[in-house]
Regions:
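Serine/threonine-rich low-complexity intrinsically disordered regions
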Residues: 1-4, 68, 85, 111, ...
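Bacterial Sec-dependent N-terminal signal peptides
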Residues: 1-24
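Generic low-complexity, intrinsically disordered sequence content enriched
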Residues: 11, 15-17, 32, 61, ...
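Accessory carbohydrate-binding/adhesion or oligomerization-edge regions at the termini
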Residues: 21-85, 162-168, 182, 187-188
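Accessory beta-strand-rich segments of carbohydrate-active enzymes
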Residues: 24-28, 37-38, 94-204
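Surface-exposed acidic, glycine/proline-enriched linker/cap segments
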Residues: 84-92
Length: 205
């Protein structure tokens, strides 16, 4: 019985090593374009982003300012301070211009007949991820990492794929400075059709 357990463990380790060898992970760090504001056609592959700012991830659009007390002016009652009436307060988020929408765009290539997943370590917030003009996933939470399988949206003709990410921070959505933008890494994960999924514990095929 002991030898059977050892054999099973060895087989599982061998399978895991084999699957790991068939998985590649690339940081999508450079060659991003960014623009503040809500731009209707920015998700489309043919959109011209040449006039946008060139950025490297991680990127926080608000930390460059301008700093202004009106950026985080809030009319609120702080119940923890036993306040019953709302009053104007400022400085709670550092006066940074984090409120609003922003777009990020880049492109990536993938081999044919593979499963492709995008893993976002941090995107603040209300992230809508588009691949080749189609929405691949939505993730509202800015502090949690998330991933989405983008295989169904990839070009099948060998052309580069366009990745666009729309983010939005709404007014009075935070009591402290939350960050703004793709403030953590973005990973491109390529696997075979049979693979262990991201954060998975079992094989899928």
């Amino acid at each position: 019985m002991k030898h059977q357990k050892q054999l099973a463990t060895a087989l599982l380790l061998a399978a895991a090593c084999s699957l790991q060898a068939q998985r590649s992970e690339t940081l999508l760090e450079k060659n991003w374009k960014f623009s503040k504001g809500d731009i209707k056609e920015a998700s489309q592959p043919e959109f011209n982003d040449t006039q946008w700012e060139s950025v490297v991830l991680p990127h926080d659009w608000a930390i460059f300012g301008p700093f202004d007390m009106n950026n985080d002016l809030q009319n609120v009652a702080i119940t923890q301070n036993f306040e019953e009436k709302a009053s104007l307060k400022t400085g709670r988020t550092g006066g940074l211009p984090y409120v609003g929408s922003g777009w990020y765009r880049t492109s990536f290539d993938t081999p044919a007949d593979k499963e492709v997943t995008l893993l976002f370590d941090g995107a603040m917030s209300e992230a809508r991820v588009y691949v080749n003009g189609k929405e691949a996933c939505f993730w509202p939470f800015g502090y949690n990492s998330f991933h989405c399988n983008v295989t169904p949206f990839l070009n099948k003709n060998g052309k580069s794929n366009t990745l666009a990410v729309r983010l939005e921070n709404r007014p009075q959505s935070s009591r402290w400075y939350p960050g703004a933008g793709l403030y953590r890494n973005v990973h491109l994960i390529v696997t075979d059709k049979i693979h262990v999924p991201v954060w998975g514990l079992s094989l899928i095929h």
